[in-house]
Amino acid sequence: MEAEDYNASYEDYPDDVDPIVVLEELSPLEGRVVRILLVAVYSVICLLGILGNGLVIVMITCKMKRTVNTVWFLNLAVADFLFNVFLPVHIAYAALDYHWVFGTAMCKISNFLLIHNMFTSVFLLTVISFDRCVSVLLPVWSQNHRSVRLAYTACLVIWVLAFFLSSPSLVFRDTARLHGKISCFNNFSLSAAVSSPWPAHPQVDPVGSGRHKVVTITRFLCGFLVPGLITTACYLTIVYKLQRSRLAKTKKPFKIILTIIVTFFLCWCPYHAFYLLELRRGSVPPSVFSLGVPLATAIAIANSCMNPILYVFMGQDFKKFRVALFSRLVNALSEDTGHSSYPSHRSFTKMSSMNERETGML
């Protein structure tokens, strides 16, 4: 790897592009180490994501009764699985020293799937939180109206909305040649970027810069902040209701879905933080992005393989590891049997005596 491969920096780029390259603040050796680590991490994520989410999809579609909960988790698994299927192109991109050989269409599709996965997952988790909240606050109404058909309808709306919010990737993602390599990047100005998208002394395009800000802030608000606030409000309401109903001692209530939600926001928080910082690139040292952006992206991508792992290790007491893997998945994904009976003291007595596998998916 020659030194000239690292002669680009964030100061060289107009505000309307978002290249994925190794920056000059990294030495050739450091850049090679980062690239190897990314290839290794992405490969592990891809393998775990395809196998884990694929297993969840098979288990739900072939082995389990269709319930509202299984509909939620089936859609989560499908969204993660689709992204992981296309993750090898990102692995190859890093392995080829950031030389994109898959064409402009795949450049658009691969980034679209990453953003679509983010929106689909966060919207599903938000709806699940709202569903749990309604089940606690209005158990009778929930028992009468909470149906598989309604869950499928909600999922359809979520997928369509996620497609709409992810569509900027299909418009602005582009490829261009730089230093003898083809890069996959965001061309928010929609300028002809075939020859040189990053001139030595670029003129900031106000239109492209404005689009960049709108897309970044929209993703942060719709894909992180607003869902996070709604989810937090739902679970604060649930905790308050359970405490007033003397159910605070219920055995680890909502532990799996709550852990999945917390994991999602922890994984995506660095990603949004760095892309918001990128809007103020001039006031942030370029070295901050050199390792921060690749690391934040890797952490965000890792979320796509986390859910099956959480299902397995939290479906039952982890100490009982002798329990078969398939049993753990079924127990974790099964419909909770007592969601509509929270206010009842009799249900509390019953729930307290239930096996962990019966309450694990609350």
Swiss-Prot record:
Domain of life: Eukaryota
InterPro entries assigned to the protein according to its UniProt record, in alphabetical order: CML1, Formyl_rcpt-rel, GPCR_Rhodpsn, GPCR_Rhodpsn_7TM
Organism listed in the record: Bos taurus
Task of the protein: Receptor for the chemoattractant adipokine chemerin/RARRES2 and for the omega-3 fatty acid derived molecule resolvin E1. Interaction with RARRES2 initiates activation of G proteins G(i)/G(o) and beta-arrestin pathways inducing cellular responses via second messenger pathways such as intracellular calcium mobilization, phosphorylation of MAP kinases MAPK1/MAPK3 (ERK1/2), TYRO3, MAPK14/P38MAPK and PI3K leading to multifunctional effects, like, reduction of immune responses, enhancing of adipogenesis and angionesis.
GO MF annotation, one: adipokinetic hormone binding
Protein name: Chemerin-like receptor 1
Tissue expression from the record: Widely expressed in several tissues including adipose, muscle, liver and brain.
Keyword RNA-binding belongs to the record: no
SUPFAM superfamilies the record matches: Family A G protein-coupled receptor-like
GO biological process, one term: positive regulation of fat cell differentiation
Disulphide linkage map: 107-184
Ranges where the record places region Disordered: 336-362
Membrane side Cytoplasmic: residue ranges: 59-70, 130-151, 241-255, 303-362
One cellular component term from this protein's GO annotations in UniProt: plasma membrane
Transmembrane spans: 38-58, 71-91, 109-129, 152-172, 220-240, 256-276, 282-302
Membrane topology listed for this record: Multi-pass membrane protein
UniProt keyword list: Cell membrane, Disulfide bond, G-protein coupled receptor, Glycoprotein, Membrane, Phosphoprotein, Receptor, Transducer, Transmembrane, Transmembrane helix
